Design a protein with these regions (language model features):
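N-terminal amphipathic alpha-helix/helix-capping segment at the start of soluble metabolic enzymes
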Residues: 1-17, 84
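Glycine-rich anion/phosphate-binding loops
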Residues: 26-32, 97-114
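Flavin-dependent oxidoreductase catalytic cores
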Residues: 13, 64-90, 96
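Glycine-rich, proline-tolerant flexible connector loops at the mouths of alpha/beta enzymes
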Residues: 22, 41-76
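Short histidine/acidic/glycine/proline-rich micro-motifs that form metal-
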Residues: 21-23, 53, 96-100
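Generic structural signal for well-ordered alpha-helices
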Residues: 1-4, 32-36, 76-81, 109
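Hydrophobic faces of well-ordered beta-strands that scaffold small-molecule active sites
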Residues: 13-21, 44-48, 91-95, 120-122
């Protein structure tokens, strides 16, 4: 169901939650535990935030620095799909246009389309 329809059809205060994907290298279980706790509030949807890439600079020791792109919280699309499938709650991935190339943005949108995730915050 579309978020706007969920909001309009609700006769009482409605809740939604914004979550962060797990840090790179960690699992999703802690996130599931958090959602299990929050489900008692009957959230109408869950927003999954995307974090843009960060840049760190490595000193090469010769007066030059190497710029490296780092994504600490990848997985917005995968987390959205996992939540939607596990909990049957509408998900709203927050997709950024900065920090990604046009091609990367297109791939994210295509992945969401394939997963039938149609509600987006851009």
């Amino acid at each position: 169901m579309k978020v706007i329809d969920l909001i309009h059809s609700n006769k009482k205060t409605a809740f939604s939650f914004e979550i962060l994907p797990p840090l790179k290298g960690t699992g999703i279980e802690k996130l599931y535990q958090t959602i299990d706790t929050l489900r008692e509030f009957d959230p109408k949807y869950i927003n999954i935030t995307t974090h843009r890439s960060e840049y760190v600079y490595k000193d090469l020791g010769n007066g030059l620095f190497q710029r490296n792109r780092l994504r600490r919280r990848p997985g917005t699309v995968a987390v959205a799909a996992a939540i939607q499938n596990k909990y049957n709650i509408t998900v709203v991935p927050h997709i950024l246009c900065s920090g990604f190339t046009r091609e990367e943005t297109e791939y994210v949108l295509l992945d969401l389309q394939f997963l039938n995730i149609t509600e987006l915050l851009v």
